[in-house]
Amino acid sequence: MKVLMLTDSFLPHAGGSREYYYNLYRHLAEFEETRVTIATKKVPGWEEFDRKASSDSFGIVRWLRPLSTWRLQELPKGLGPFLHAAWHVAKDNPAILHAGDLYPQGVSALILKKMTYLPYLAYCHGEEITLTDRYKYQPHMRNRVYQGADAVIANAEFARQSLLRIGIPESRIVKITPGVDLERFSPRPAREELVDKWNLKGKKVVLTVARLIPRKGHDLVLRAIARLTRELPDAVYLIVGRGPEEQRLQKLAAELGIMDSVRFAGYVPGELLPDCYNLCDVFAMPNREEANGDIEGFGMVFLEANATGKPVIGGRSGGTADAIIEGKTGFRVDASQLDELTERLRMLLTDTNLRRQLGNEGRDRVQREFQWRDRARKLHDVSMEICKARSREKRTAILANPE
């Protein structure tokens, strides 16, 4: 089975969906007689990443290449990726297309299906629906892409319910939540050089690993820390990541008078992220839905933190109900209620036994339920069934019209 995956959401560009696709397709390609090609765009750092990924079992092709005397990037948005996809369909003759993004990849898959009868499955992380609901014409094209798909992969229950709401048949929705690399994310002693670098010795550390954008809720944690510092003077907030909100968050920390209790770590290489989780006492990302409909589709960071034995706090919006079991692996809070977040942080920072209990349960749950190989098997089986069904349809058509 040849699989051609079309997506703009792929490493080395940072983000949960990029990690989701990388791990899912890395394991999918390990199945016998399954060949996977990722068709994606060039982003900063792609050459080094592709060299390192050359040992993986899938291929990566990047668009924005010269074509005759002009370049694909000079074409209107959407046409370049479509031509790139069409060229690889003609060249490689895949059995199925996977569309990782609604636009332009999902639209490209829909058009190619009409042109070539090639089946496709599409992905939904939830925000594809919440972000387009507010527009006049986008919901129509969105619905055509999902209705035309042979299957739609929902990454969480929130996404599955959103698909049902817009009329996608339940029989065509397959829920495949993210997994965790348990060899990479595991409990280990704190790395002393990082403890010294960020002056964390003897501190109670609250950690967020995320892009610095509004829906992640960094500002809420800052305000909660400001409330707690008098009672818990050793509490420190470690922020790992970069983003457009960095200056605003630094300004807020200064206004709250807590700069000494905040560490802006900036970009941290992926190989050091497990060590960052192991530095903290509590992982907190009180995500919220933005006015434009932007939401947290799942929250892979909650699983990564649990995998290292840490309790987590997340927001109640989006798909976090799949990532956090309330009172078992952590807590979900109403991000509009600062009192609730503050109290949950106080509870965890002052109760060692509770932290250990939730962290251990989180680790056990991740080991039981969130193996990447299991998710890849589900994707493999869905894809194979679609390909077999299409083959049966073709044989039936040939028998019905022998001439």
What are these regions (language model features)?
Residues 1-50, 401-403:
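N-terminal subdomain of nucleotide-sugar transferases
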Residues 250-271:
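Nucleotide-activated donor-binding/catalytic signature segment of Leloir-type glycosyltransferases, i.e.
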Residues 325-327, 331-338, 347-353:
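Conserved acidic donor-binding segment of nucleotide-sugar-dependent glycosyltransferases
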Residues 234, 261, 340, 347, ...:
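A short, well-ordered alpha-helix in the C-terminal region of glycosyltransferases
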Residues 4, 200-216, 222-225:
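Conserved donor-binding/catalytic core segment of Leloir-type glycosyltransferases
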Residues 302, 307-314, 324:
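Short hydrophobic beta-strand element within catalytic cores of glycosyltransferases
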Residues 261, 267, 278-293, 310:
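Acidic donor-binding loop of glycosyltransferase active sites
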Residues 42, 158, 179:
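Carbohydrate-associated surface elements
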